[in-house]
Amino acid sequence: MTHFVAIFFSSLFMCSNVFAGSVSSVSLGSLSSALNERMQVMKAVAGYKALHHLPIEDLPREQVVLDHMLQNAQQAGLEPHSVEPFVHALMNASKTIQYRYRADWLSSPDSAVPVRDLTETRQQIQQLDTQLLTAISQRLMTGAFSQEDKEFLMSHLTAPHLSESDKNSLFASLSRIQRQH
């Protein structure tokens, strides 16, 4: 009888490890996809701001984004205070990408500047932010972010104008996010 109990528990342990690994890989894929898409949307934001002669940095809007993400973080089961540095890193990378696009357009004035309605673009960004927080929460259910996770994300974050230092800043703040207790 003890032999069967040992087999049962070892099978249960193996299944939980397989499940945890699959959740981890799925959530990392979702995380990298949402991050890439969010960074790619910055081209449209930069285009709108360039066309309407708006500054890239918009501190009141950043506060709205921060408040919204912290509220969503709590709903996703994350500790909001631990998410705040990630949100700042995300917004800084987003602004940096916008500046890089604006610089490209200044040096190549004939290039087409994409223009979309900013309200629609912001709705898309909010949806992506929710996806990001959900993927982070799911990943943290299996444990903290690892070096392998960093390598995966660094190799899969391929959005134009996202530099290695941007990626490092994002991952450093991402690795400090915690689930609520």
Swiss-Prot record:
Signal peptide: 1-20
Any one cellular-component term (Gene Ontology): periplasmic space
GO aspect biological process, one term: chorismate metabolic process
Alphabetized GO MF terms: chorismate mutase activity; protein homodimerization activity
Binding site for substrate: R38, K49, D58, E62, Q98
Subcellular location: Periplasm
Major location (coarse): periplasm
Quaternary structure and partners: Homodimer.
Name of the protein described by the UniProt record: Monofunctional chorismate mutase
Record lineage: Bacteria, Pseudomonadati, Pseudomonadota, Gammaproteobacteria, Enterobacterales
